[in-house]
């Protein structure tokens, strides 16, 4: 009886935790993750081969992190990547390391993995004009405040700081 009670308690706790998370529907198509995913999926084979390597090797700029952290309040992020894309393979682990450094709540990050056509089976990319990956879109009060596209102008931290603090910023493909 005691084991049954513990099992039921564990199931209820697990169910309530899962109910609060975003719907994760990513599947592997032609060897690539496609759909709404989470960081944990990238930390599993076969994606962990590149994720772990680029995460471990990245050193965040602590000076910029200390400036970035207070500006992250009220921000939500949509992160569009392709697990087939070299730039995404490098930038995604760096992005998550930066978010951990500023103690950003991952529930405010939506990871959308796209195919080579920059789409998902559920059209999660629709309305966001995703032309290159990675594309990281920052929102405040449900309005886009800026986006990082493919590679940094300065560093990822410095680019993010400009976006969330309201400084003038143009991503790598804006003139």
Regions found by a protein language model. Give the residues of each.
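Thiol-based oxidoreductase modules, predominantly thioredoxin-like and allied folds used
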Residues: 78-83, 106-120
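Short Fe-S-cluster ligation motifs
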Residues: 117-131
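Non-catalytic, surface beta->alpha helical segment in thiol-disulfide oxidoreductase systems
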Residues: 132, 137-174
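Bacterial Sec-dependent N-terminal signal peptides
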Residues: 1-24
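Loop/turn elements at helix/coil->beta-strand transitions in domains of secreted/extracellular proteins
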Residues: 73-76, 107, 141
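Local sequence-structure signature of Cys/Sec-based thiol-disulfide redox active-site neighborhoods
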Residues: 70-101
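Acidic/His-rich structured neighborhood in mature extracellular/periplasmic domains
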Residues: 111, 131-132
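Non-globular targeting/processing and membrane-anchoring segments
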Residues: 17-62, 66-71, 159-175
């Amino acid at each position: 009886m005691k084991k049954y009670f513990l099992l039921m308690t564990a199931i209820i706790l697990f169910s309530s935790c899962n109910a609060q998370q975003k719907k994760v529907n990513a599947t592997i198509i032609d060897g690539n993750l496609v759909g709404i995913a989470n960081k944990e999926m990238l930390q599993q084979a076969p994606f962990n081969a590149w994720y772990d390597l680029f995460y471990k090797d990245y050193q965040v700029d602590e000076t910029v992190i200390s400036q970035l952290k207070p500006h992250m309040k009220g921000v939500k992020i949509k992160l569009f990547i392709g697990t087939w894309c070299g730039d995404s393979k490098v930038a995604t682990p760096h992005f998550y390391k930066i978010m951990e450094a500023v103690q950003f709540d991952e529930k405010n990050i939506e990871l959308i993995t796209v195919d080579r056509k920059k789409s998902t089976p559920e059209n999660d990319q629709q309305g966001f004009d995703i032309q290159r990956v990675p594309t990281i879109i920052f929102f405040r009060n449900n309005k886009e405040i800026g986006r990082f596209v493919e590679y940094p102008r300065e560093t990822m931290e410095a680019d993010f700081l400009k976006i969330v603090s309201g400084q003038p910023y143009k991503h790598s493909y804006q003139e």
